[in-house]
C-alpha cells in the first residue's frame, strides 16, 4: 500500500464510521468538495498536510489520530 492509498482509505473509513458523505466532510472541514474528491479519486497524489489537518478538524480528531493506524505504521519506505 502506498502512502496516498493509506490516506484515501483512512478518509473513507472515518467517513463510514461517522455515516457522513464526502460532501458533508467537505462542509465540516471548510474545504471545497473537489479538494477531497481529488484526494479520493487520484487527481491529487500529494495532498498538503494543511488539507489533511482541515479534514481532521472537520472530523474532530487530531493528526495523530488520523495517522495512528496499522496501515500508516507499516508503510514501506518511499525512498528507493
PLM regions and their residue ranges:
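Residues within the helices of the helix-turn-helix
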Residues: 12, 23, 53
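Residues in the recognition helix of alpha-helical DNA-binding motifs
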Residues: 14, 28, 39, 69
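A short, Lys/Arg-rich alpha-helix, primarily the initiator
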Residues: 1-20
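Short, charged recognition helix plus adjacent turn
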Residues: 38, 67-80
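The alpha-helix within a helix-turn-helix
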Residues: 15, 26, 56
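Short, basic-rich loop-to-helix N-cap that marks the start of a DNA-contacting helix
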Residues: 43-57
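Short alpha-helical DNA-recognition segment
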Residues: 19-38
Amino acid at each position: 500500500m502506498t502512502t496516498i492509498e493509506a490516506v484515501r482509505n483512512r478518509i473513507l473509513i472515518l467517513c463510514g464510521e461517522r455515516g457522513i458523505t464526502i460532501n458533508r466532510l467537505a462542509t465540516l472541514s471548510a474545504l471545497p468538495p473537489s479538494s477531497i474528491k481529488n484526494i479520493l479519486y487520484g487527481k491529487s497524489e500529494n495532498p498538503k498536510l494543511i488539507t489533511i489537518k482541515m479534514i481532521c478538524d472537520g472530523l474532530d480528531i487530531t493528526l495523530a489520530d488520523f495517522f495512528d493506524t496499522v496501515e500508516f505504521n507499516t508503510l514501506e519506505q518511499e525512498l528507493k
